[in-house]
Amino acid sequence: MKDGLGEAAVDKIIHCLLEAGADFSTESFRKDALSSLHTLELKDRVRHLILVMHRHLPQSFPKAAKILQKIRDHWPQDDTPGGPTYFAAWPITNYVATHGLNHPEISLPLLRYLTPLYTAEFAIRPFIETHRKQTYEQLLIWCMDSDEHVRRLASEGTRPRLPWGKQLPSYIEDPTEVISLLENLRDDPSDYVRRSVANNLNDISKDHPDLVIETCERWLQDAVPERKLSLIHI
């Protein structure tokens, strides 16, 4: 999988950042990015490229965010699964979590904007822990978003035990808020979103099996066929 964040992905990141208004030396960025990249596993590559981006973007997060707020307009839609640039946007979404945590008023809308490029389900998690009320209010709004990627983020980003992701101790202890989000998404028109809802319930069941059984029984009472199909996977 790490091959999806190699040299081709670095070149794509450079091109799109420059097109979005960044001002740095392509040669310098590329040299920094490729140094030791081949020795790193996937998640370490993400962290390495975040460091490189921070070195070459404005040090002020609000100024850097103005560049990232334009990057989707210049992002070629060629990140096919297994392809050489599939994970190219992952360092960009996680950059927001690493350097924008103290600016939720900028970062949360930015994650909404970026998540169609590569899911922000990992990047949203520090905001849930640090700015819980403000983030939850955004998640409720995202449940109604016209973009399925944004709606899925409201579910996948709140999974208490997301694989590869930081666990959410507050939601492991009390998943009430998560269940409320899932109530809004259980009949989502997108199977992509409904599968995330089922996976979230699976996570919750590891710590609160009775709550998930009660929730599934309640949902089955008036379930449309799509909802029934989703609940089969729990």
Where are the regions a protein language model picked out?
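Surface-facing alpha-helical segments and adjacent helix-coil boundary elements at the starts of domains
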Residues: M1-L231
